[in-house]
């Protein structure tokens, strides 16, 4: 493994401005998308009962755990036997509403609250569970460099690596996330957000 140090391309002032902009945009989005969020919650409640929000522990800035929020897309106790890396086509664990939400990435809406709170940024590496981080670290210990920055809702790696359903894909995602870490800027973030929105509008699954 290469003995290279990976550093955040943003300086302290840029990081503070990025966090401030994320906070303002998240506040506006929480208000603007509240009717859509309520509609999603009602649809989940009618089909499969409560809870409508699913929370899961992920690892974020400085390696600290936090709870990520999503609209529940799977049946209750879908992972009672433990985490499952492989997402099966036509996954029977998904509810009908959940499948629709995932297809249009609406299950991610509650993560606006994570951005508002400061757990996450609008753009950054996707946060992972410790269960999978431990497995990744066995193959590539560079993962800890990602702890320098807040995880994001969309990421550079998601655009070009798709759903990470195998360990080779997870390792490729790590390499892409490290590239983002070393090159991130407001302009880079804007391009990632734009490409993500285009993919969502055209129904691309990633």
Describe the function of each predicted region.
Residues 8, 12-13, 142-206:
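C-terminal terminal-structure detector
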Residues 22, 107-108, 177, 189:
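Acidic active-site catalytic centers that drive phospho-/nucleotidyl reactions
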Residues 1-6:
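Hydrophobic transmembrane alpha-helix segments characteristic of membrane transport
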Residues 87-150, 193-196, 200:
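A short, structured surface patch at a secondary-structure boundary
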Residues 54-93, 154-173:
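Short, glycine-rich, amphipathic interfacial segments at transmembrane boundaries or analogous
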Residues 26, 41, 54, 95-99, ...:
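Positions in alpha-helical segments
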Residues 9-77, 114, 186-206:
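A hydrophobic, helix-centered structural microdomain
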């Amino acid at each position: 493994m290469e003995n290279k140090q990976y550093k955040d391309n943003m300086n302290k002032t840029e990081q503070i401005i990025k966090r401030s902009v994320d906070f303002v945009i998240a506040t506006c989005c929480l208000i603007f998308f509240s009717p859509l969020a309520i509609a999603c919650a009602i649809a989940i409640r009618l089909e499969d009962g409560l809870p409508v929000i699913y929370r899961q522990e992920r690892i974020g800035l400085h390696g600290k755990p936090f709870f990520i929020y999503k609209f529940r897309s799977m049946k209750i106790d879908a992972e009672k036997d433990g985490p499952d890396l492989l997402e099966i086509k036509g996954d029977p664990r998904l509810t009908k509403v959940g499948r629709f939400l995932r297809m249009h990435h609406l299950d991610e809406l509650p993560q606006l609250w994570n951005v508002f709170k400061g757990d996450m940024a609008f753009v950054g590496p996707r946060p992972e569970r410790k269960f999978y981080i431990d497995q990744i670290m066995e193959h590539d210990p560079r993962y800890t460099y990602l702890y320098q920055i807040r995880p994001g809702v969309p990421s550079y790696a998601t655009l070009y690596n798709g759903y990470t359903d195998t360990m080779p894909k997870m390792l490729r995602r790590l390499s892409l996330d490290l590239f983002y870490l070393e090159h991130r800027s407001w302009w880079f973030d804007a391009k990632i957000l734009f490409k993500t929105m285009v993919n969502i509008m055209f129904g691309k699954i990633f």
